[in-house]
Amino acid sequence: MQEEEHKKFIDVERLIGEKNPKALKWTPRFLINYLKRKLHQDEINRTLAENKHLQDYDFCNNIIDRFEINVISSGVENIPLEGGAIFVVNHPLGGMDALSIIHSIGNYRQDVKFIVNDILLSLKNLRGIFAGINKHGANSKDSLHALEELFSSNKAIFIFPAGLVSRRINKKVEDLEWKKTFISRAKKYNKTVVPVHLDGELSKFFYNLANFRTKLGIKMNIEMLYLADELYKQKNTTIRITYGEPIPASHFNQSKKDIEWAQWVKKQVYLLKDKEKN
């Protein structure tokens, strides 16, 4: 039984215990149970256990089917069918963004690599597709080198330049500032950049909590604890993905700084939303 516990992808009590054993001892049981429910601990662990034999594209397709999500892709003629390219995507839905993108792109390319955060790197079902930097691990330098090699490869690389799920600001759901990494790597390795727009929103609760937390000056992203709950709210929905025209690396000249080019590409991504409506 103890061995099975350590195989759980989500284990609230173990996570708290590893971070602060004293905190686990004094944390009220009702709070632990609340976190388990909001993180959908049992449901996610059960789903992963039932699908442990599925990897990468097959796993994503299975999850999309389980959630009865209809993924509609447009602009697929803009997808480079071979050669290295960096696909940059807005990040409105959290984990379902990557799953739906992989489900969509799998019909055109089987050499996809998705750059994700530390936590998702431990998801074994997608270890053939997910890549990233374990910032807190002993091999962080090695993973950084591996990521550099990835950008120089001929693979289809997907990245969320914002690094965070979109927020609602001035009644508009949009990514925060995009990081410039994809611009600098596109220039360094002469890679085409493909803008991709994913249409969707989370609940009002998520955005209100994020804004309230920000107004209080709390730096910890408390709202991230609710992303699993938001994931399950996306059952029986339609997700629209639009691939824009590829942008050659030569376009990113000296007329703008890399960070400015990143925001320019971000604007092009959101302009694709208007094309979705037409």
What would you call each of these model-derived segments?
Residues 67-73, 139-141, 223-225:
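Short gly/ser/thr-rich secondary-structure transition/capping motifs
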Residues 1-85, 98-100, 107-109, 127, ...:
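Membrane-anchoring hydrophobic helices of lipid-metabolizing enzymes
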Residues 78, 119-121, 137, 200-202, ...:
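Residue-level detector of flexible, active-site-proximal loop/helix-junction positions
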Residues 71, 112-114, 157, 193:
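Hydrophobic beta-strand scaffold residues
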